[in-house]
Amino acid sequence: GKSGNPFPWESGEVKSDKGCFYANFKPDRGNYTMDGSLITSKCGIFSANSNGLYDMAGNVAEWTSTVYVESGVESMSDMNPDLKYNAAKEDPYRLKRKSVRGGSWKDPESLIRSAWRGYEYQNQPRSYVGFRCVRTMISDTRGTSGRGKKK
């Protein structure tokens, strides 16, 4: 989120002052339907954030292509680490873990932050893990992201 906010919307709260939830997650112990969905919800049900983006938290946790290591990103020197390893069938099971980010419909609000990191085993389908299409912004030589016009 912006300015140290743990969530991708303006407030540090998970629901508005009118009681409307900002994302699909488990708001109460054992209560999966309080936010209006039993499991995953349709895209766009919750309000967009200040950038006009929908569903940036909750609903499903996100698969990443990054290998899960216990030490986390602290052991990597890059600001946007991408540690790859395509485990073979005969590799030990611990080498088949991929990092999962954010939380899902089955998780409490503390886990729907994109900073939350866990793992699942590759090639193991889960109803609470999905993916987002992302790409790296390519900068020109002046350090802009190509959004503005060049003079």
Feature names for model-found ranges:
Residues 1-118, 125, 142-150:
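Functional-site microenvironments in short loops/helix caps that host divalent-cation chemistry
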